[in-house]
Structure formats: C-alpha cells, structure tokens
Swiss-Prot record:
Protein name: ATP synthase subunit 9, mitochondrial
Keyword field: ATP-binding, CF(0), Hydrogen ion transport, Ion transport, Lipid-binding, Membrane, Mitochondrion, Nucleotide-binding, Transmembrane, Transmembrane helix, Transport
Presence of keyword Ribonucleoprotein: no
Gene that this sequence comes from: ATP9
Function according to Swiss-Prot or TrEMBL: This protein is one of the chains of the nonenzymatic membrane component (F0) of mitochondrial ATPase.
PROSITE patterns: ATPASE_C
Family assignment from sequence similarity: Belongs to the ATPase C chain family.
CDD domains, sorted: ATP-synt_Fo_c_ATP5G3
HAMAP family per UniProt: ATP_synth_c_bact
Transmembrane segments: 8-28, 53-73
Length: 74
C-alpha cells in the first residue's frame, strides 16, 4: 500500500516537468519572434533567453528532485 502511494506521489511530482517543457518552448519561441522583428538586438535577447531557460529548467530540476526524494527517501 505504501509503495503504491509513493509511486503515485512521484508521478504527480513529475507533472511539473511537462509545464517546464512548455515554458522552455515559450522562451525560445519568443526569442525567435523577437530576433525576426529586430535582428540588431539578437545578442542581448539571447542572454535574456538563456536566463529564462535557466530559471525554467531550475523549476523542472526541483520537481525531479522531489520525485526522487519521494521514491527513495520516504
């Protein structure tokens, strides 16, 4: 019973990974649209896009860490 609850909890914790994937897609989609409109700002916008990617990916890594904690620690 407890093992099944752990698996369900870990699966629920990984739902955030799908949201992070959508967020990363939005970051780079916005980058492509912005560079297409104003190519002279490409270098500056790329820095902002990498920052957005890193922050979004951090949320995904925290969610994955929670899933592993649920599976192997509790």
């Amino acid at each position: 019973m407890l093992e099944g609850a752990k698996l369900i909890g870990a699966g629920a914790a990984t739902i955030a990974l799908a949201g992070a994937a959508v967020g990363i897609g939005n970051v780079f989609s916005s980058l492509i649209h912005s560079v297409a409109r104003n190519p002279s700002l490409a270098k500056q916008l790329f820095g902002y896009a990498i920052l957005g990617f890193a922050l979004t990916e951090a949320i995904a890594l925290f969610a994955l860490m929670m899933a592993f904690l649920i599976l192997f620690v509790f």
